[in-house]
Amino acid sequence: MGHVKILIAILVFITYSFVPVAYAQVKIGQKVPDFVTTTLDGQKFALKDYLKQPGNKVLILTFFATWCEPCGEDLKFLQKLQAQYGDQGLRVLCVFTGRISKVKAAKKYLEKLDVNLPVLLDKRRAISKRYKVTGLPCNYAIDREGFLKFKCLGCSEEVKRKFEENLRDLL
């Protein structure tokens, strides 16, 4: 019995010893993982290229799903911020974490909310895993050099107030 426990402990240690650095928790001030995916409309998207586009100063990367009720409120809030601060360099990109088979449902969800923000597809949750998304909605503020400036989870009034305050400091 003792040998089984030791063997399990060794296997767990070996397994977690080889977790790639790219999958480590993204910390404030660190460079965020780059990724390539497609948009909801089927266009190719590369984060590093997007960050370098003229006029882009701060990117909010928000992770959402259609089953997540607070995500709807968060998306409306972010659309309001995009309208308010877009001319100052704010860009908001939504990452749909649902299954690719649910793309039509995602489009309907966004139409129902009257949200017109660009949407990226998170195939097999690869982006969510790289960013260590543990709950929804989850927002990352990234500067044009690709560094994480702040992040938040949830959409309470206090979270939104602090989020907008931090955002204004970056713009």
Segments and roles (model prediction):
Residues 66-73, 138:
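C-type cytochrome heme c attachment motif
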Residues 1-41, 150-152, 161-164, 171:
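N-terminal targeting signals for export/organelle localization
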Residues 36-59:
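A short beta-strand-turn-helix
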Residues 72-113, 123-130:
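Structural microenvironment flanking redox-active thiols in thiol-disulfide oxidoreductases
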Residues 59-62, 91-95, 118-121:
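Structural recognition of the beta-strand scaffold that forms the well-ordered cores
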Residues 40, 66, 97-100, 122-124, ...:
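Solvent-exposed coil/turn segments that connect beta secondary-structure elements
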Residues 57-59, 63-67, 135:
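Short pre-active-site segment immediately N-terminal to redox-active cysteine/selenocysteine motifs
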Residues 109-115, 123-166:
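Thiol/disulfide oxidoreductase modules built on the thioredoxin-like
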